[in-house]
Amino acid sequence: RRRQRQMCIRDRDLSGNLAAGTSTGGMTNKKWNRIGDAPIIGAGTYANNATCAISATGWGEFFIRSVVAHDISALMEYKGLSIQEAAYEVIHNKVAKLGGDGGVVGIDRNGNVTMEMNTPGMYRAKMDALGNLIVKIYQNE
């Protein structure tokens, strides 16, 4: 199985509104009529001004079954977890236990960013309020 690159975008505007967008190149040798997690709101993409904006990349079937993006938001809203705690819980203790791999990029209503993954690497970047760009590939960076 070889995955194509996926573009995940999440943003917070000056008024505090959150947005998420996810685009995918799909999966090589995918099954005919397969729909991945990217176009499914709550699985691969989700935004809620009260909590966070999340975009996901990974093995879509597991992200759909786990409703990854919405689940992170729900853990923040109902359990009071931080975006980092919620993302870790979903990616490592839900998706991974089902056999799925991948990660998420997200931003919460306060501008805190998560880039959580259960894979050795995931192309990701963020820009801070001063315009400094931070680009990472491997998990230990």
Residue ranges and their predicted role:
Residues 6, 99-101, 120:
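Short, small/polar residue-rich loop motifs at catalytic or cofactor-binding pockets
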